[in-house]
A protein has these predicted regions:
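Short, charge-patterned binding micro-sites
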Residues: 40-58, 315-319
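Internal helix-turn-beta structural module
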Residues: 46, 306, 313-418
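Glycine-rich anion/phosphate-binding loop at the beta-strand->alpha-helix junction
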Residues: 196-300
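Conserved phosphate/anionic-ligand binding catalytic regions in large, soluble enzymes, centered on
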Residues: 8-10, 14-19, 115-130, 244-269, ...
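Glycine-rich, mobile lid/loop segments that gate access to catalytic sites or pores
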Residues: 6, 66, 73-245, 371, ...
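A short glycine-rich, hydrophobically flanked beta-strand micro-motif that places a catalytic Asp/Glu
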Residues: 37-41, 165-171, 233-237, 303-314
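Alpha-helical support elements that line or immediately flank enzyme active sites
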Residues: 12-31, 129-148, 278-302
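N-terminal, positively charged regions that mediate nucleic acid binding
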Residues: 1-40, 155, 409, 415
Length: 418
């Protein structure tokens, strides 16, 4: 019997994502001027107020307030009407130095033996149901949100849009786990109060979502995803009606509260650790990226149609405690999942410092991850410029989403005889 599966995404203007982007913008600023910086930065946003908290170990001083304000304005919170804007919000900072007890457990004379920054288990997942090896429900939900933000920033149509928005996509799967069609698309978007007649205002937004937003979304899809737009799709647009009050004024935002949006939309598994604001010594982040890198390359190589990879650590210990693989019965090699996991451990060095080197995680590459998902994104090199009241302006080439590279596929095929 067929079944339905749902994933959601949120816009860069969602309050939790505002907090994530502030945390990662600050991380990037530290890394731009001190590639060895260690950070664990949490941000909190509410009506007219930002609180920045956490632990940092760095040789440089960063103007936290300036970076936070620039980030908020870049997202689109620039008007006093929003009750939260980058120019006028209050900003309270409470940053202190990282615990020496943690430093002693992580630092080693031989940096290859750098210990994990914490205990925990991390997961990576990949499926061949889309070209970027992501669940189709999440991939489409992200694309809807990115496209809506593009329309808002262009300011040519749907000029009533405000930054906060959410999407949700439900997909029907066949008995054997293949996506068949899109069943429901939910879009909730914040908007100006542009018509005294609420029914007419809602009708306009619904019409624009169907006739402006969705055609632009479809124009960006590959053949696999376009085939799913068949039959009657139930569009639910702003189901509560009016959505004028939103963003941090409507709901308090906090770093790390959208961990399923950030990863696989409910597919696979999640170890519970958030990403934003954390440098790569924190395996919550770096090992989750490495596990995605392993899973994606393994699926792309044809080892399985779908794969979940778990890796776990003890604080202060470099070697992983375990590596686990689940191919969901979709393996194409004559090996058990346990045997596949053993080969993964032999092929991939998953010690924290090795992961940093393998994925080039000491670059200021994190702001771009903080909205629209950390996984399934485009690996590319971009030029980024960092300015500071305390340091010279710095322009550098930064490689983004290194864990999305498919540079181990040929090696994996040789090892597995594919």
């Amino acid at each position: 019997m067929s079944y339905l599966f749902t994933s959601e995404s949120v816009s860069e203007g969602h309050p939790d994502k505002v907090a994530d982007q502030i945390s990662d913008a600050l991380l990037d600023q530290f890394l731009a001027y001190d590639s060895h910086a260690r950070t664990a930065i949490e941000s909190f946003v509410t009506t007219g107020q930002v609180v920045i908290m956490g632990e940092v170990r760095s040789e440089v001083y960063i103007d936290l307030q300036t970076i936070a304000r620039k980030t908020i304005n870049k997202i689109g919170y620039t008007k006093a009407d929003y009750q939260f804007d980058g120019n006028s919000c209050g900003i309270l900072t409470a940053i202190h130095e990282q615990s020496e007890d943690i430093n002693r457990g992580v630092d080693r004379q031989d940096e290859d033996e750098q210990g994990a920054g914490d205990q925990g288990m991390m997961f990576g997942y990949a499926t061949n149901e889309t070209d970027n090896y992501m669940p189709v429900s999440l991939d489409l939900a992200h694309l809807i949100m990115r496209t809506l933000a593009d329309i808002r920033k262009e300011g040519k149509v749907m000029t009533y849009l405000r930054p906060d928005a959410k999407s949700q996509v439900t997909v029907e799967y066949s008995d054997d786990g293949h996506p068949q069609r899109i069943v429901t698309i939910v879009v909730s978007t914040q908007h100006d109060d542009f018509d005294a007649d609420e029914n007419r205002m809602l009708a306009k937004i619904k019409d624009d979502v169907k006739n402006i937003l969705m055609p632009r979304v479809k124009a960006q899809l590959g053949e696999k995803e376009l085939k799913l737009f068949k039959g009657e799709i139930d569009y639910k647009v702003n189901p509560t009606g009016k959505f004028v009050i939103g963003g941090p004024h409507g709901d308090t935002g906090l770093t790390g509260r959208k961990i399923i949006v950030d990863t696989y939309g409910g597919k696979g598994a999640h170890g519970g650790g958030a990403f934003s604001g954390k440098d790569s010594s924190k395996v919550d982040r770096s090992a989750a990226y490495a596990a995605r890198y392993v899973a994606k390359n393994m699926v792309a190589a044809g080892v399985a149609d779908e794969m979940l990879v778990q890796v776990s650590y003890a604080i202060g210990v470099a070697e992983p405690i375990n590596i686990y693989v689940n191919t969901y019965g979709k393996s194409h090699v004559n090996m058990t999942d346990g045997e596949i996991a053993k080969v993964v451990g032999e092929m991939f060095d998953l010690r924290p410092k090795a992961i940093e080197r393998m994925l080039k995680l000491r670059q200021p590459m994190y702001f771009e991850t903080a909205a629209y998902g950390h996984m399934g994104r485009k690996n590319e090199v971009v030029e980024k410029t960092f300015t500071s009241h305390y340091h010279p302006t710095k322009t550098m080439q930064v490689e983004l989403f290194t864990w999305e590279k498919l540079d181990r596929v040929d090696e994996i095929r040789r090892v597995f005889g594919l």
